[in-house]
């Protein structure tokens, strides 16, 4: 409800972290953006596999429509992470596993979009980009799970955890959940609009 959102926003606005002060509020953009950067690519991978198996245009076009959104979220993750890192680590960038995997993920997003623009006709473009997307899914998975298996460097562990001792404070936890829901809802809306537009373009092309 609006009251829940306004209450959460008010609490976040007033509260400061005793170590990071105001900079901790970057978390409400950084974490949802990172969540989408990874999961949008994984969704693209699933859609690409569906295209290769079932040859359904909607799956290929949904993957295509997701790519720019995922790219923007990846860039937002890297920028906000750099700003946050400058405050907490004293540097904008370090080549630790999490950051490096996101840099590679960014390259795969850019490469995917370029391939869609460069290759014709649609079927061939869908085939090539689907294979490319599946290859890049390895780095999307690394971006998500690498902190569980190897030394995470300067980057912190998972922000949200089922272990209450490792979880963030409740005053940030619930507003962060709301931010995740908001970002995810925006993605779904944009995906539906962009995919519908792509399908309409395809219909007009086939009719013409």
Question: What are the roles of these predicted feature ranges?
Answer:
Residues 129-145:
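Hydrophobic alpha-helical membrane-insertion segments
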Residues 21-28, 88-102, 125-128:
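Non-cytosolic membrane-interface motifs at loop->transmembrane helix junctions
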Residues 53-64, 119-126:
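Membrane-interface helix-boundary motifs at transmembrane edges
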Residues 1-13:
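Single conserved hydrophobic/aromatic residue that forms the stacking wall/gate
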Residues 148-185, 206-208:
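Membrane-interface transmembrane-helix boundary segments in multi-pass integral membrane proteins
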Residues 72-114:
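Membrane-interface helix-loop-helix modules in multi-pass inner-membrane proteins
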Residues 196-208:
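Extramembrane terminal tails and long inter-domain/linker segments of multi-pass membrane proteins
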Residues 32-47, 104-116, 174-192:
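Hydrophobic cores of alpha-helical transmembrane segments in multi-pass inner/ER membrane proteins
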């Amino acid at each position: 409800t609006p009251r829940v959102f306004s209450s959460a926003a008010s609490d976040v606005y007033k509260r400061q972290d005793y170590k990071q002060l105001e900079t901790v509020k970057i978390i409400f953009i950084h974490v949802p953006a990172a969540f989408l950067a990874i999961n949008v690519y994984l969704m693209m991978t699933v859609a690409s596999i569906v295209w290769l198996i079932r040859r359904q245009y909607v799956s290929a076009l949904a993957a295509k429509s997701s790519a720019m959104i995922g790219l923007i979220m990846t860039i937002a993750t890297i920028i906000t992470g750099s700003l946050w890192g400058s405050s907490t680590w004293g540097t904008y960038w370090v080549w630790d596993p999490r950051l490096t995997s996101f840099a590679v993920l960014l390259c795969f997003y850019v490469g995917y979009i370029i391939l869609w623009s460069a290759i014709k006709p649609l079927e061939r473009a869908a085939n090539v980009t689907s294979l490319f997307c599946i290859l890049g899914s390895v780095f999307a998975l690394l971006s998500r799970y690498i902190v569980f298996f190897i030394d995470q460097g300067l980057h912190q562990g998972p922000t949200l955890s089922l272990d209450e001792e490792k979880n963030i404070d409740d005053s940030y936890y619930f507003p962060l959940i709301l931010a995740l829901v908001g970002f995810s809802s925006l993605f779904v809306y944009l995906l539906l609009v962009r995919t519908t537009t792509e399908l309409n373009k395809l219909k007009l092309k086939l009719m013409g």
